[in-house]
Amino acid sequence: MDKGVIVYICDSQGVRDIYEADGISTVAASEPLVVLVNKGTASASEILAGALKDNKRAVIYGEPTYGKGKIQSVFALSDGSGLAVTVARYETPAHTDIDKVGVIPDRPLPASFPTDEDGFCSCLRDSNSACNLNAAQLFTR
């Protein structure tokens, strides 16, 4: 990603910190990019997926992500235990709160893929596949 907002961190008073890419160390910024996500994609990986999606840098395929949109601090208690307190939340560059919702893919995919007789995914060869993939459109934004 060249330049652009990566994430907003919003605290309970409504203060919004902006984290941006400066474009200085960009690698392959104009090459096609596809990101595969699922319900195991959480926290920092959700931030990355949301930033790439909202900045139109990548096409996101898969299932909605986990939805870990809160930032917590743990405070030590005198008995040795700790108390986790939510102190802020993440917003994507489009100001989407991902907590409990996740990043919604541009192109949904099923949780499992049909396979051919050799055990390989048959999605790209079968135009009627439930995968909803089209090889010619795979990298279009």
Predicted regions: what they are:
Residues 1-141:
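C-terminal "post-core" interaction segments
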